[in-house]
């Protein structure tokens, strides 16, 4: 029953419930900001044995950009996504910076990095509370909670004071909402009526629900921090080829405004997000057994020198088959995009600088093609990118901050590093990354202030547009490795390719039929209720594909369509 703990196996790890169902399950659409996602799985005796990930919306930005001024790229590519818009602006700007050969000033690097830090904090808070937590939290079970008991639990896991009155107010508001019969985003949620895959007790559900509401208000602060230097959010307007345009970012007033918003956001991360993550993770330790992948790639992030990836606070690296004793250096020439199973002309794998975007829609699985996404590969292998890749590689490289936070999380949960290769590990890594970046923003901010105090007020460098050039911009966005690739011809965009985190993780098979990370991660996932496959969505959501709208689940035996809302 929802709100009750699952039966525990020896060692205190819950036994994950599963059904005896065999047949297909289709979740369509699983939507996100970049487009729509369709997940199709084959289940045998209650476990997933095969999976297909399909992006069902054509984007076509690469086609739109051809023939335009390279400086305009950032304004178009930001519209790829309404959440992490700045990362695309940064990737496009770095891409053209690289093509024209300009070295940007120190202050510009600091300002770009600070806005990116705020972007990370905003994205990861929103993901945990509003896109992923409700795969684990039963909001309606919070109505059964004792607010006084819940307040004691909250105070035991966080230094923040939480009163019974505060939680009672949330519970009363929730009760009124439920009794109205108009559940809005919770209509037909998986947990309504109870679901065996939800384990949290009522008090923990009440605490999480209260923090869900608080995070709605808090994420505005992180977004505002981005706008302090970025002019607005979403779709910032301060990056230009050669640096930034925001001269007011040099003033004490604007710096103080950013600093105040960062401090408030960091306090929430330290006192709310991380404690909540640890409580949820402790209850769902069985999810350290599912959702893992083998290959990882990160471009690293927060550079001192834009031209040196190894100057980044997080270093780049590549790992195959979980061999973290043998971290490979990143080589941009080893990236290829495969289209054999995508709705594009041809079947040849191409490096992004030679990439083509020529649509060829068949139908679902016609000619074995089933997605508008291409399939990026590194040395021919599918690679997971994102917080888990960045944390695992940084940990293995001996990154002191990452090691300290990761070891503390693992010790608190009583598990070893191997537990990170999982759905739960991916979710925990996002929290670890958030905590490390939240602290590092303060370090960067102080360095920026010190640099200004030395009399440096330069924020942009001059440059000239070449007739012919190639460039690439690498950003480790909140969802992972993002790269923009440009070929300039006669001073205009001759070709432009975006290789985004979601194509790395959520793309289709390649020409060698190797599954993408999300497809591979779903194999072996238990499903307790085929009509409410929350387990599938736990793993899909752990990659952070911004879920927002309605979903249909098709029963393979009856062809009955079950409609419900992703939470």
UniProtKB/Swiss-Prot annotation:
Instruction: Give residue ranges for the propeptide.
Output: 553-567
* Key words, A-Z: Iron, Magnesium, Metal-binding, Nickel, Oxidoreductase, Periplasm
Q: Which PROSITE patterns match?
A: NI_HGENASE_L_1, NI_HGENASE_L_2
- CC annotations in GO: periplasmic space
Which Pfam families does the record cross-reference, listed alphabetically? Answer: NiFeSe_Hases
Would the keyword Ribonucleoprotein be found if you checked this record's keyword annotation? no
Which residues does the record give as Fe cation binding sites? 84, 549
Q: What's a Gene Ontology MF term here?
A: cytochrome-c3 hydrogenase activity
- The UniProt annotation places Ni(2+) binding at 81, 84, 546, 549
Principal EC category? oxidoreductase
Which Enzyme Commission number(s) are on file for it? 1.12.2.1
What reactions does this protein catalyze? 2 Fe(III)-[cytochrome c3] + H2 = 2 Fe(II)-[cytochrome c3] + 2 H(+)
Amino-acid positions noted as binding Mg(2+) in the UniProt annotation, renumbered to this chain: 62, 498, 552
User: Would you say which domain of life the source belongs to?
Assistant: Bacteria
By its UniProt entry, which InterPro entries does this protein fall under?
A: Ni-dep_hyd_lsu (IPR001501), Ni-dep_hyd_lsu_Ni_BS (IPR018194), NiFe-Hase_large (IPR029014), NiFe/NiFeSe_hydrgnase_LSU (IPR050867)
Location in or out of the cell = Periplasm
Query: Which cofactors are required for activity?
Result: Ni(2+); Fe cation
Q: Does the keyword Metal-binding apply?
A: yes
Record function comment: Catalyzes the reversible oxidoreduction of molecular hydrogen, in conjunction with a specific electron acceptor, cytochrome c3.
Subunit arrangement?
Heterodimer of a large and a small subunit.
Query: What more does the record tell us?
Result: Perhaps the leader of the small subunit serves as a transport vehicle for both subunits.
Q: Which PANTHER family match?
A: HYDROGENASE-2 LARGE CHAIN (PTHR42958), UPTAKE HYDROGENASE LARGE SUBUNIT (PTHR42958:SF2)
Q: Can you tell me which family this protein belongs to?
A: Belongs to the [NiFe]/[NiFeSe] hydrogenase large subunit family.
| Protein name per UniProt | Periplasmic [NiFe] hydrogenase large subunit
- According to its UniProt entry, this protein's organism is Nitratidesulfovibrio vulgaris (strain DSM 19637 / Miyazaki F)
